[in-house]
């Protein structure tokens, strides 16, 4: 009997790992030429970058900056900041826009929270962003591990903590109760794009489920700021973008990031369009008119880029290239 249960469980996990069927790369047209505003060169202190990379390697930690091929890696590492990725480097989903490796993840490293706390202390940073791969293989999607990391960090460091979480497969009541043990300063969950394109770019995810997660967390923990983000250039329409922003605001989200999707490799979804700077500025104005407290919009904006500024600074009419 136990053997049959084990087989069923194994098949269930395998089914989860194989829900992604990339049909999106068929009929790929010629790759779009990058416009000038996408090409950037940032002065880099390579010794500082190696210092941070070595600190991560030393404690077997990961940064989403590296794993997701973030275009801001050099700048952020050069400034001594990093977004930590917990629960390993292998994701149970295979979204065709994402560069993070997918497959069967390793067991949860119970020593990771303390190692993370020690590394943050050694780096001397005062704002921490923690994200994770999706762990559909775990009963709570990794929520308890997030809480353990928050506890360990706060025990040793005087820092603000932002968490960027997956959708936990809709186990909302369970994860809300788990987070009651330790709360972040900012709760971030990316909506990513418009609902019409979800089957194409976020197989395994659900637009309404993501909205409900954000709304439910805000209702239960009203003192915690909620945040979300979109990436553009995958075929969405202006009217759809505006509706998503309205949906997010109605769900209690007050902090917003909007950036340009950049294709990590030829094996990922191609860019349909590069959004001009003027359009990002219009999106920012629209977001503020909807009611968002803070909106960072620009080609290189990512969820955790300049996150510490967004967490406590009022909106200013800064040049969009400096965001």
Curated annotation (Swiss-Prot):
Signal peptide span: none
Catalytic activity: [[Fe-S] cluster scaffold protein carrying a second [4Fe-4S](2+) cluster] + N(6)-octanoyl-L-lysyl-[protein] + 2 oxidized [2Fe-2S]-[ferredoxin] + 2 S-adenosyl-L-methionine + 4 H(+) = [[Fe-S] cluster scaffold protein] + N(6)-[(R)-dihydrolipoyl]-L-lysyl-[protein] + 4 Fe(3+) + 2 hydrogen sulfide + 2 5'-deoxyadenosine + 2 L-methionine + 2 reduced [2Fe-2S]-[ferredoxin]
InterPro entries for this protein: Aldolase_TIM, Elp3/MiaA/NifB-like_rSAM, LIAS_N, Lipoyl_synth, rSAM
Cofactor(s) for this UniProt protein: [4Fe-4S] cluster
Gene3D superfamilies: Aldolase class I
Cofactor note: Binds 2 [4Fe-4S] clusters per subunit. One cluster is coordinated with 3 cysteines and an exchangeable S-adenosyl-L-methionine.
Keywords on record: 4Fe-4S, Cytoplasm, Iron, Iron-sulfur, Metal-binding, S-adenosyl-L-methionine, Transferase
List of residues binding [4Fe-4S] cluster 1: 65, 70, 76, 304
GO-annotated cellular components: cytoplasm
Any GO MF annotation of the entry: metal ion binding
Chain ranges of the Radical SAM core domain: 77-293
Keyword S-adenosyl-L-methionine carried by entry: yes
Amino acids binding [4Fe-4S] cluster 2: 91, 95, 98
Intracellular or extracellular location(s): Cytoplasm
EC number(s) on file: 2.8.1.8
Pathway the protein takes part in: Protein modification; protein lipoylation via endogenous pathway; protein N(6)-(lipoyl)lysine from octanoyl-[acyl-carrier-protein]: step 2/2
NCBIfam families in alphabetical order: lipA, PRK05481.1, PRK12928.1
Family: Belongs to the radical SAM superfamily. Lipoyl synthase family.
Protein name: Lipoyl synthase
Organism: Buchnera aphidicola subsp. Acyrthosiphon pisum (strain Tuc7)
